[in-house]
From Swiss-Prot:
It holds the Pfam family Ribosomal_L33. InterPro entries: Ribosomal_bL33, Ribosomal_bL33_CS, Ribosomal_bL33_sf, Ribosomal_zn-bd. One of its GO terms (molecular function) is structural constituent of ribosome. GO terms for biological process: translation. The gene is rpmG. Belongs to the bacterial ribosomal protein bL33 family. Keywords: Ribonucleoprotein, Ribosomal protein. PROSITE patterns: RIBOSOMAL_L33 (PS00582). This is Large ribosomal subunit protein bL33. GO terms for cellular component: cytosolic large ribosomal subunit. Gene3D superfamilies: Ribosomal protein L33. The keyword Ribosomal protein applies.
Length: 54
């Protein structure tokens, strides 16, 4: 049986192609995650939104 955590990718909203990978508990957080994190390609903090790992 599979675990309760899904691997996800946090994709930069600055359209630089930069992303972070993490996992989330799909039972406790059913919605899409959104974080403000550092994007080294534009050298500033931007919003990262959840996307699937292909």
């Amino acid at each position: 049986m599979a675990g309760k955590r899904d691997k996800i990718r946090l994709i930069s909203s600055a359209d630089t192609g930069h992303f972070y990978t993490t996992d989330k508990n799909k039972k406790n957080t059913p919605g899409k995650l959104e974080f403000k994190k550092y994007d080294p390609r534009v050298r500033r903090h931007v919003i990262y939104k959840e996307g699937k790992i292909k």
